[in-house]
Regions:
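Extreme N-terminal segment that seeds HTH/winged-HTH DNA-binding domains in transcriptional regulators
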Residues: 1-46, 54, 58, 77-82
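Minor-groove-contacting beta-hairpin "wing" of winged helix-turn-helix DNA-binding domains
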Residues: 33-34, 63, 68-74
């Protein structure tokens, strides 16, 4: 994860996922780690993981259907490729 001074942890997490999505490392429809998994892997709280996912949703890079998890959005990837 990038260590950008002055940025909150949730923004750094979201920026890292943004880079993975836009580079194609994470594909459209691919499931992201759960809040719990993300928090454990990154040494953060679940609230921080939740904030990162909300920011990715706001950027339209991730879709989070209720009760199903978080997935890389199809529409944003397709728009970037056109």
């Amino acid at each position: 994860m990038n260590n950008t001074a002055g940025q909150p942890l949730y923004q750094r997490i979201a920026n890292d996922f943004t880079a993975q999505i836009t580079s194609g490392a994470l594909k459209a429809g691919e499931r992201l780690p759960s809040e719990r998994q993300m928090a454990e892997e990154l040494g953060a709280s679940r609230m921080t993981a939740r904030q990162a996912l909300k920011l990715l949703e706001k950027r339209r890079l991730v879709e989070t259907p209720v009760g199903r998890g978080a997935f890389v959005a199809h529409s944003q990837i397709e728009q970037q490729l056109s």
